[in-house]
């Protein structure tokens, strides 16, 4: 009966909503697919074989109250004529999934029932005065026969029939938050409104955009009309079936999904319907409507009392938010708190940038590294902020009639970046299963914009030399998210990373925001092909090299400095005037193959570089560990390793070694070194000497073969040469580790200049990335699997002697000397014959 009930609900809801003149009639696709099926089903009559619905017998209540009116005189003879319409009634066909084998029931419902009037009330006489045109409502619940005492049971949804979507409404009825809108601050006390176009500012068509507009993106305005989707009628169905369908003016949609989660946000004029579902948690739903609107809950058919409104906080000056979910007060308190926070986001501001900034900060929050695996509360908060940013962006763009080019590109880029972080870092999604789509642009305008941006990307790479513009070109390719865009910028991105690495080896500190931003988008476009399927040989080679160089750029000093920079930036950001944009603080460690950044030695290094503050040491240590763990989770993609470093995940005998890699070094196109804390059963294995036995280090050279062997590391000194010649070091990797088991650096020897620098050995007083003051051991890893110990680059511990100890030692020497002199004098006096001459 359930499918039939839905059939009834759709028909009646369509009839009720049909009173709004802006509704667009559409043909039921089932009807088109079912043409000709009437020949398969029939009923025997005196005149032939026809399909005819059943009709209630008016003499048999209660169904008889829904019988056809007498004036229609419907019989088996008149039913085939399809003269079923009667002005005072709505007819409804109730059937099941077996239709038309199941002929169904043809019911008639007086329109007075739909109007909520007594059955004996008469309709008002038609007026001759044309009604005043009223603007259609932004949000209109479609309640159907909710208030009809006879037929409402027929329209109950599957909620309360097979499950209860909101088992504990009181748990989801909570007071308004501290930062939500008030009468004096209708957009929230911490809201920083988005910029408005100046009076008379020109609206540029997307087809005329050029590099000059990119230079001045913050003052380039695009007209909303024709660029964004025009609002259109749409019926929003709550997936939880907890409330009746809602008629809205839709403006777009945001969808994020993967193998472990799905998020869908439907945007409308003064409306947002957000659904968050995960494999590891019950689904949650948030609905935002105008302040004066109420969404009624679908109640239990057996309950005589009318159902109340959906749960949620009290309404505000602009919106009312309803929160749905199966969480109860006995469930996880953090999950319930996260859902309540998500319910407050829509009333906390109107600027999309504030929500994206908060989402980035949420990703690096103190508990980000507290546990492994999916974390529903964090995922709900991240996706809630992400969806609300889209809600704010669309509303502001339609309200202003224009959108700034920098805001358009920024929203599309940062929302895509955050979607990946939320999916991989909070939901536990496989990296190659993540998909993301923001459908807020008009389809035709989107194609025009993408074509223009593709042209601008090619023009930037061909004519411009500025690092900032090249970073913008990679950002545009990231926004376009198309194979052609990625292929167009990949050679330039690979060259940029090589150039930055050369500057790093020369002693330059890569800490400016534009460098971070360029590294972020360059790394993203080089890693992207593995998401679209099996990468080509060229794509794999570029990605392997970018991963190797990112690992080389991530020395222990860089990792500690990154942690300190992130802590400082997060503490400084107020998400109002000072925003936190993650690409501006991007670290190569997050794009590397180093998965050891959350180990204790790195945490101590980061704490040692922390500046003085009033933050308690325990809190600072927790924040530091959280940031380090987040960097590791951000970088560690199992799918990425399978795509670009397949030898590290190669299976032998049907099983792969259950060893967690700490560092991967893809040294050739088909071989890698891997650092672990336990030996591997295959490859060429080396045990690193001089390391704490509690945290041993093993270095293994891996290929696609399954043979295993062990070797000893040979100690050597490189021969210094007077002339420039190839020493055979290009392609090798310089690795330094400490007795505590910390790998300080894995530096690629990529040029002849670099190999000459190593051959010259460390120079006292000349700082170099190959030298260190920390007691450590230096190795050289060759592409053929050979490893040698570079004695010249070892740093030995120097004994520290206090000045007091030196003074005491000198005094002791003087006293001992005086004592010996006295003894000799006594001996000479007492034994004179020792000195007699013969």
From Swiss-Prot:
Region (Interaction with gL) residue spans: 259-323
Coiled-coil regions, chain positions: none
Glycosylation sites: 73, 120, 216, 332, 437, 670, 784
TM region(s), chain numbering: 804-824
Residue spans, topological domain Intravirion: 825-838
Highest taxon of the lineage: Viruses
One GO CC term on file: viral envelope
Range of residues in the leader sequence: 1-18
Sequence ranges on the Virion surface membrane side: 19-803
Biological processes annotated in GO: fusion of virus membrane with host plasma membrane; symbiont entry into host cell
Renumbered residue ranges of the record's region Disordered: 174-204
Gene3D superfamilies reported in the protein's UniProt record: 1.20.58.1340, 3.10.360.40, 3.30.500.50, Herpesvirus glycoprotein H, C-terminal domain
Topology with respect to the bilayer: Single-pass type I membrane protein
Record's comment on post-translational modification: N-glycosylated, O-glycosylated, and sialylated.
Keyword annotations from UniProtKB, A to Z: Fusion of virus membrane with host cell membrane, Fusion of virus membrane with host membrane, Glycoprotein, Host cell membrane, Host endosome, Host membrane, Membrane, Sialic acid, Signal, Transmembrane, Transmembrane helix, Viral envelope protein, Viral penetration into host cytoplasm, Virion, Virus entry into host cell
Subunit structure: Interacts with glycoprotein L (gL); this interaction is necessary for the correct processing and cell surface expression of gH. The heterodimer gH/gL seems to interact with gB trimers during fusion.
Record function comment: The heterodimer glycoprotein H-glycoprotein L is required for the fusion of viral and plasma membranes leading to virus entry into the host cell. Following initial binding to host receptor, membrane fusion is mediated by the fusion machinery composed of gB and the heterodimer gH/gL. May also be involved in the fusion between the virion envelope and the outer nuclear membrane during virion morphogenesis.
Similarity-based family: Belongs to the herpesviridae glycoprotein H family.
Protein name as annotated: Envelope glycoprotein H
Gene name of this polypeptide: gH
């Amino acid at each position: 009966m359930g499918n039939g009930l839905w059939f009834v609900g759709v028909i009646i809801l369509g009839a009720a909503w049909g009173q709004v003149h802006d509704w667009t009639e559409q043909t039921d696709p089932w009807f088109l697919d079912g043409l000709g099926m009437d020949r398969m089903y029939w009923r025997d009559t005196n005149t032939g074989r026809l399909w005819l619905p059943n009709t209630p017998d008016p003499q048999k209540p209660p169904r008889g109250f829904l019988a056809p009116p007498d004036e229609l005189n419907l019989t088996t003879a008149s039913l085939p004529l399809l003269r079923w319409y009667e002005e005072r009634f709505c007819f409804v066909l109730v059937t099941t999934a077996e239709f038309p084998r199941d002929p169904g029931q043809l019911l008639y419902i007086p329109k007075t029932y739909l109007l909520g009037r007594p059955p004996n009330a008469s309709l008002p006489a038609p007026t001759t005065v044309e009604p005043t045109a009223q603007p259609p409502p932004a949000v209109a619940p479609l309640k159907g026969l909710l208030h009809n005492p006879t037929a409402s049971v027929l329209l109950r949804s599957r909620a309360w029939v097979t499950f209860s979507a909101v088992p504990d409404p009181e748990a989801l009825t909570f007071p308004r938050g501290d930062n939500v809108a008030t009468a004096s601050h209708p957009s929230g006390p911490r809201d920083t409104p988005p910029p408005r176009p100046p009076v008379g500012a020109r609206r540029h068509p997307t087809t005329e955009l050029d590099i000059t507009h990119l230079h001045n993106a913050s003052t380039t305005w695009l007209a909303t009309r024709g660029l964004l989707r025009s609002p259109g009628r749409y019926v929003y169905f709550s997936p939880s079936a907890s409330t009746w369908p809602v008629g809205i003016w839709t403006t777009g949609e945001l969808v994020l999904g993967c193998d472990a989660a799905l998020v869908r946000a439907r945007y409308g004029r003064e409306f947002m319907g957000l659904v968050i579902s995960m494999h590891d948690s019950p689904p949650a739903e948030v609905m935002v409507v105008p302040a004066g609107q109420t969404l009624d809950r679908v109640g239990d058919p057996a309950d005589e009392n009318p159902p109340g409104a959906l749960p949620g906080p009290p309404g505000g000056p602009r919106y009312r938010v309803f929160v749905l979910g199966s969480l109860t007060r006995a469930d996880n308190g953090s999950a319930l708190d996260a859902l309540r926070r998500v319910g407050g986001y829509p009333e906390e501001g109107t600027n999309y940038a504030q929500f994206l900034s908060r989402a980035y900060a949420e990703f690096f929050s103190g508990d980000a590294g507290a546990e492994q695996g999916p974390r529903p509360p964090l995922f709900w908060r991240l996706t809630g902020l992400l969806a609300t940013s889209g809600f704010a962006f669309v509303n502001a763009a339609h309200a202003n009639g224009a959108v700034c080019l920098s805001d358009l590109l920024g929203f599309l880029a940062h929302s895509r970046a955050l979607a990946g972080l939320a999916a991989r870092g909070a939901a536990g999604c496989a990296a190659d299963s993540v998909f993301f789509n923001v459908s807020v642009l008009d389809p035709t305008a989107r194609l025009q914009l993408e074509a223009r941006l593709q042209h601008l990307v090619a023009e930037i790479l061909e004519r411009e030399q500025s690092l900032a513009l090249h970073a913008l070109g990679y950002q545009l390719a990231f926004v376009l998210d198309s194979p052609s865009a990625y292929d167009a910028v990949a050679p330039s991105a690979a060259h940029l990373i090589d150039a930055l690495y050369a500057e790093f080896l020369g002693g330059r500190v890569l800490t400016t925001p534009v460098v971070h931003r360029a590294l972020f988008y360059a790394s993203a476009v080089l890693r992207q092909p593995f998401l679209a399927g099996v990468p080509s040989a060229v794509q794999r080679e570029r990605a392997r090299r970018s991963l190797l160089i990112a690992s080389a750029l991530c020395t222990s000093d860089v990792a500690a400095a990154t942690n300190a920079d992130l802590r400082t930036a997060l503490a400084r950001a107020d998400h109002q005037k000072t925003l936190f944009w993650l690409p501006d603080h991007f670290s190569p460690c997050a794009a590397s193959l180093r998965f050891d950044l959350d180990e204790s030695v790195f945490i101590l290094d980061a704490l040692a570089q922390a500046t003085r503050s009033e933050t308690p040491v325990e809190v600072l240590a927790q924040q530091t560990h959280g940031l380090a763990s987040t960097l590791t989770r951000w970088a560690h993609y199992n799918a990425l390793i399978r795509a670009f470093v397949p030898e590290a995940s190669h299976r032998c005998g049907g099983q792969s070694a259950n060893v967690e890699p700490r560092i991967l070094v893809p040294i050739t196109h088909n071989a890698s070194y891997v650092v672990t804390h336990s030996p591997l059963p295959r490859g060429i294995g080396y045990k690193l000497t001089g390391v704490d036995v509690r945290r041993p280090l093993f270095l293994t050279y891996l290929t696609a073969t399954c043979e295993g062997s062990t070797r000893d590391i040979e100690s050597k000194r490189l021969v210094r040469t007077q002339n420039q010649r190839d020493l055979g070091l290009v392609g090798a990797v310089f690795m330094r580790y400490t007795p505590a088991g910390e790998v300080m650096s894995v530096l690629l020897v990529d040029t002849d200049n670099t190999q000459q620098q190593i051959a010259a050995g460390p120079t006292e007083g000349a700082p170099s990335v190959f030298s260190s003051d920390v007691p450590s051991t230096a190795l050289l890893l060759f592409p053929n699997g050979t490893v040698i110990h570079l004695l010249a680059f070892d740093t030995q511990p120097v004994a520290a002697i206090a000045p007091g100890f030196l003074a005491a030692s000198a005094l002791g020497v003087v006293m001992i000397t005086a004592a010996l002199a006295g003894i000799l004098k006594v001996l000479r006096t007492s034994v004179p014959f020792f000195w007699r001459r013969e």
